[in-house]
Amino acid sequence: MARIELPAPSGMGEHVDWALHRPQMAVGMGQLADAVYGGTRLALREREAARYTIALINHCEVCLDTRATEAAAHAVDDGFYAEVADWRASGALSERERLAAEFAQRFALDHQAMDDAFWARLRGAFADDELADLTMCCGMFLGMGRAMAVVGVPAPDERILI
């Protein structure tokens, strides 16, 4: 149950309704989400490794339950998410997927631990435009996921597909 009273239901779900207290800001949040999900050039598994890592950190019920629309075509299933949850020990994730999860974890918990050695590993696997993409994705995942967790927005009855 959300920790703030929700406006009249919009039909879009509580993950949207809570933000409708400030419609202009809600529109901006929606546009940012659309830009991130629609504009990323990261592979789906890389994006999902970063997104799910931050969802675990944020304890965002909505984010933890959200799945990718094209998941089956990219072998993104419950087993994949279990591997992401244990990315350090996973032998099933690619180097880029593990790095995306590690980047997301450091981004969310200790961005100052992103030292030159870590950036060298990142730049050995990703081009600079991909690192900019990953950074913007993680910013959106962290900010919006944390906001929904703070407000206490529950996962919807019907899973969100992105």
In which residue ranges do the predicted regions lie?
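Preference for long, well-ordered alpha-helical segments
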Residues: 128-162
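Alpha-helical scaffold segments that form or flank carboxylate-/histidine-based iron centers
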Residues: 11-18, 43-59, 89, 125, ...
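Mobile cap/lid helix-loop segments that border enzyme active or cofactor-binding sites
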Residues: 1-48, 68-72
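A ubiquitous short alpha-helical element
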Residues: 13-21, 86-92, 102-106
